[in-house]
Amino acid sequence: MINRYTREEMGHIWSERNEFDTMLLVEILASEAQAELGIIPKEAAVAIREKGDFQVERIREIERETNHDIISFVTAVGEYVGPEFAKYIHLGLTSTDVKDTALGYMMKQACDLLLKGLRNFREVLARRAVEFKYTPMIGRTHGIHGEPITFGVKLVNWMSEI
């Protein structure tokens, strides 16, 4: 993403740090579900939630050795969780399980942000439509002048499309 053209909130959603944070959330939730099912010890899920962390630079450092993004991520998180419970991180999961789930959640976050912006934009259009309900303007049809309308009507038409 090009920073100067990116809203700060959207940039955060698609940042490398947030991608890893979201992957960690997937790993935490998976470990908690596995603990509930008796697949891993409950203490492991607690340790993964409470101690699970990472440094992006450390992930990159490990990735230069492993040439695998998920192995480097799991290894880096495991360094924080500790050797007793690190073996339970990513247990029974594939790289795609984690990456695709994280990506889907990030897309949901992005859509929520876009929808919030559209709702705000719709409110502005509604308010401005009332303000300009008597302001005349030339209507358009087939790319040429048409019957006169008001700017308020134009704004209401745009609003109805949102």
How should these model regions be labeled?
Residues 1-161:
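A helix-coil-helix interface module used to build multimeric assemblies
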